[in-house]
Amino acid sequence: MSQSSTKNLGDLRVEIDSLDSEILELLNKRAAASLAVGAIKAGSSDQIFKPFREQEVLRGLINRNPGTLPSEHLEAIYREIISSSRRLQRPERVVYLGPEGTFSYFAGLQHMGRQADLLPKNNFEDIFVAVSKGEADLGIIPLENSLKGTVGQNVDLFMRYPVYIQAELFHSISHGLMTKGADISEIKTVYSHSKALEQCTGWLRANMPGAELVSVESTAKAAQMVAGSDETVAAVGHVKLANIFGLHVTAEAIEDLPDNWTRFLIIGPKPGQEGKRDKTSLLFTTPDRPGALVEVLSELSGHDINMTKLESRPALGEKWKYMFFVDLQGDLGADEHASLIEDLKARCLTFKILGSYPAGSQEGSKI
């Protein structure tokens, strides 16, 4: 390396050091402002997690970004800054389907940042219980997958527990095959969550026709089991599980269809309080008579409310009766829709607004 290029490199490093000092000073000023906000919130019941405000900050930064720093890098950096700001105001307990390493865990880590306390639960009902009892501030649950449909159990749990949707996230899902180093031909058993096995059945049958596919509670549990077993077993799940449990990634992107997305919900103990809430989810049951559902849908149509999802579920404990989960565009919690809500309640046996919240980006991101 020439003296000229060495000098230039040295000058650049001095410049970077100077910029880092400026960034550090600004980060501490931002932290002080966050603490001041937290002090104001401390005297009220205001929520720390503000999905609309965070979305507004991120979109504003991305729109102003000149482009030298890729927008996805900028978003990742600022999610951690925002996570730190929330932590300074008050530690947040966020529960998810464990153990560490599930897709819910990685979705929470990416969206809530590393400063949130991510706490694993054994099943979905434990998440709803923790949030409804105030044992956790927030919960992260998968609601539906683009290939395999709705997670019906979580729809049912919304009817049983007083929790509300705060935000939604769309994430691209990709699966890998993880082993302790054995060749695929030596694998006798493959463990994973039932949904993950369903999404990879074609690849597994084509490449491992003799292997038994065994469903377990989660993809992370599958990796955990493989780590503690012999070399004849494998797990299907997020490839980052290999780092957590000391496994080998034997094959990547083994899902049968590449366009695989999961919609996650962030749930809390009370409805979102402010900001742009451009999506609403409802859960209701109707009387057992002809046209009852049509009457409800006609009320929505008559108010120019666009419905983006309608799904029926068996009403728990009531033979041949159904409840309906609906997604709508708009904020049905707004004052302008008060009369519509009363009309809907009058036509339903049970009626619950699960939340009005900022619509997630359909483009999503890869976990």
Language-model segment annotations:
Residues 1-367:
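Domain-level signature for soluble enzymes in the chorismate/prephenate branch of the shikimate pathway
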